[in-house]
């Protein structure tokens, strides 16, 4: 996920420190999430230098797309441009088609017509593999995250492929719930924390606003009261 939502505030120095922190914490893989953007060249140079492998999503996430002729022409060129730009990096471990779209299309979330299911398969199981065959046949391709290998074959199966498990956060389940599973590869899970006091000071004037139940704190909580209660 981008280290800054205001991309102009990003810097090579800040990103290097974050990646160095990852290495020191014994991370070995960095995932570039499909809901963000393709990083600059120096991001991959730093990963090369530090020995961090990169899981690279293509920039598609949490949606469905209508594969019109104009859109297909556009994304084909986007794929080719970024594949050619990044394929030489030793840190590039795999290409991934999208974030969470196979799972949700399989569940018919966001889907309003059958052609969107067809277009999903065309984009991630035909077009991208064909382009990779021509321009980077050596790098592994994974159709989605999570996935069990594609074609809507139980894409969030805990025993195959990779899994996104958010039932502790979104489902209000207790932390010991994690101990019930032995995921083959858990590529997403987590729980929100509150920001540090230094950050809170930037958007509060009255100490009364520091209360987590205050109006100001609730408005800065993306999930409003329900997420505040979980934390």
What are these regions (language model features)?
Residues 33, 118, 176:
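Short, charged/polar micro-motifs that form catalytic or ligand-binding hotspots
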Residues 56, 99, 187:
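Active-site flanking residues adjacent to catalytic metal/cofactor-binding acidic residues
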Residues 95, 130-133, 145, 149-156, ...:
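Substrate-binding clefts and catalytic carboxylate motifs of secreted carbohydrate-active enzymes
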Residues 9, 42-43, 106-108, 196-198:
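Short, solvent-exposed loop/turn and secondary-structure capping segments
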